[in-house]
Amino acid sequence: MEEVGGNGGPARIAECGKIGSGTINSNVVPSVNLPSPSVKPSVTPSVKKPPHVIRSDYSKPREKPAKVAKKPTVKNDKKPKPVAIVAPTGIIKTFKTTPNPNRNL
């Protein structure tokens, strides 16, 4: 069912391939006879492999890409250097990481 409007009038629903109001448009084609171009009719033969070919494709091993030798990733391979923090009282304490500000020096 297509809505066909003409001469600026209200769109009417075209029934059974009839064109609605207004002048006859050569572009308007009844949708009963022709399918929309985006929908492919099921009559068209689709290219498919025979079942035995599909099974043989799965049975043979697939080619795997050559693995590139990667360096082993080591997490935290760089250890933090001890940092000397001078407290206001002059006491030197070393911390391996940033000290907790809530902790008493």
From Swiss-Prot:
Superkingdom classification of source: Eukaryota
Protein name: Uncharacterized protein K02D10.3
Low complexity bias spans: 31-47
Stretches with biased composition (Basic and acidic residues): 54-66
Region Disordered: start-end pairs: 31-80
Organism, scientific name: Caenorhabditis elegans
